[in-house]
Amino acid sequence: MKNLVVLTGAGMSAESGISTFRDAGGLWDKYPVEQVATPEGYQRDPALVINFYNARRKQLLEVKPNRGHELLAELEKNFNVTVITQNVDNLHERAGSSHIVHLHGELTKVCSSRDPYNPHYIKELKPEEYEVKMGDKAGDGTQLRPFIVWFGEAVPEIETAVRYVEKADIFVIIGTSLNVYPAAGLLHYVPRGAEVYLIDPKPVDTHTSRSIHVLRKGASEGVEELKQLLIPAP
């Protein structure tokens, strides 16, 4: 089977009702990104940051995967699918995708404040545990913090993502502005002979001269059309 590698951004989950910090409305309107999505913001006011992510976790319990998520999972019948996502939700998992690389962390996990990427201190939260409190400790005795890659922090999974992109036969970009690095740079690792598709209702600057099939649609409609293009009807 061919290797199908999909890079998804906020537009993938927007149809499920998850607000992004680039959109008006929603949780992100109440706080500047610097307050709730940087290491400095966390050091300044850990309680504010922890409560902000508690609210995001609660929101995640109230939304469902959309048809786009489900269609990507269905493509596993025909392709070796790897989903590389900039999203921190678990909607790809809940839709049935089995191979996902989370570049920016996972909302459903918490970790050590001192050593965020030490696997011994990363904990998966059950749905009923969405609320983390000040004083909840990781295995090393530090405050449990969200397992999120904040602005200014390294992206440990980027090398894993590059390895999959370098082997792609088909590379698909869905719902990302390609403005956030290092994820935006993944396009440069796509092999020369691979097909590239871009699904987004808005124009996106891909910063490349290579040929790209553009589907100017939202995630669900775009993935539906992509499926028809990749698997023609008999």
Swiss-Prot record:
**Any GO CC annotation of this UniProt entry:** cytoplasm
| UniProt-annotated binding residues for NAD(+) | 9-28, 86-89, 175-177
Q: Which reaction does it catalyse?
A: N(6)-acetyl-L-lysyl-[protein] + NAD(+) + H2O = 2''-O-acetyl-ADP-D-ribose + nicotinamide + L-lysyl-[protein]; N(6)-succinyl-L-lysyl-[protein] + NAD(+) + H2O = 2''-O-succinyl-ADP-D-ribose + nicotinamide + L-lysyl-[protein]
The protein's name in its UniProt record:
NAD-dependent protein deacylase
Q: Tell me which UniProt keywords the record has, alphabetically.
A: Cytoplasm, NAD, Transferase
Q: Which cysteines are joined by disulfide bonds?
A: none
Where in the sequence is the active site?
Answer: H104 (proton acceptor)
